[in-house]
């Protein structure tokens, strides 16, 4: 019975001592992995930041090339009444006096050329 107790005690002591060593090794491995993960995340973050800055630069270049005066101002579409003195018909449309409808209103309309 004594040999069983001694054997059990010996196995228990070995398990505890080896378990502690494994626990320390596991802790060190986890620290190394988290440090590597942080460096990888920092690298990925910097790469994403560079790509976003490049995209922003391209967008700002396109905005600077486009002038505010180059855009067409608001215009009047086809079949919409317009003022005789201020024709703002859209491109491809001309201001004409209507043939049938609109003669009662004495106004001009925008029509296709």
From Swiss-Prot:
Select a single GO molecular function from the record's annotations and give it. Answer: toxin activity
Organism (species)? Cyriopagopus hainanus
* Propeptide, chain numbering: 22-74
Record has Disulfide bond as a keyword: yes
Q: What is known of its domains?
A: The presence of a 'disulfide through disulfide knot' structurally defines this protein as a knottin.
Q: Which InterPro entries match?
A: Toxin_22
What is the name attached to this protein's record?
U11-theraphotoxin-Hhn1n
Q: Which domain of life is it from?
A: Eukaryota
């Amino acid at each position: 019975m004594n040999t069983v107790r001694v054997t059990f005690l010996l196995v228990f002591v070995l398990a505890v001592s080896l378990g502690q060593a494994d626990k320390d090794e596991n802790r060190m491995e986890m620290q190394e992995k988290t440090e590597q993960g942080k460096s990888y995340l920092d690298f990925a973050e910097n790469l994403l930041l560079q790509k976003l800055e490049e995209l922003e630069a391209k967008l700002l270049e396109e905005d600077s090339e486009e002038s505010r005066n180059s855009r067409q101002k608001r215009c009047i579409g086809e079949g919409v009444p317009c003022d005789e003195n201020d024709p703002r018909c859209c491109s491809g449309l001309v201001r004409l006096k209507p043939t049938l409808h609109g003669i009662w209103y004495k106004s001009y309309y925008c029509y296709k050329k």
